[in-house]
Amino acid sequence: MMSLKPDWVEYSNEEIEDLIVKLYREGNSTSKIGIILRDQHGIPSVKAVTGLKITQILEKHEMKPEYPEDLMNLIRKAVNIRDHLKEHPKDLHTRRGLQIVESKIRRLVRYYVREGVLPEGWRYDPQKAALLVK
């Protein structure tokens, strides 16, 4: 794939990959890595410069996260809402919010199973999700 590297980007593809691996080892998420590269290193888009997405670069270096970041964020949010509902069982607005978040999780899981990111038959279970997040 041809990459349209801006003239003012001073990093080579190998240097960008090394930066991504270093930032991931420091505990940064893929989205945070993109923000750091944009704001501190002047790399507007990793895909535009290298031709690969951040997750593809991590996969190439065998550092791919077990679950996609967006799914983990939604699961974390659902676990926090469940904890809130244990203390405030009559909070109906939050209960509705939990239904919406869990619906998003199920739709995203369906997509990731279809795309082969998650194994066939992977299901969202709130009890297992709490263990997964912690």
From Swiss-Prot:
One of its GO terms (cellular component) is cytosolic small ribosomal subunit. It comes from the Archaea. One of its GO terms (molecular function) is structural constituent of ribosome. SUPFAM superfamilies: S15/NS1 RNA-binding domain. The keyword Ribosomal protein applies. Keywords: Ribonucleoprotein, Ribosomal protein. Coiled coil: none annotated. GO terms for biological process: translation. Belongs to the universal ribosomal protein uS15 family. Part of the 30S ribosomal subunit. This is Small ribosomal subunit protein uS15.
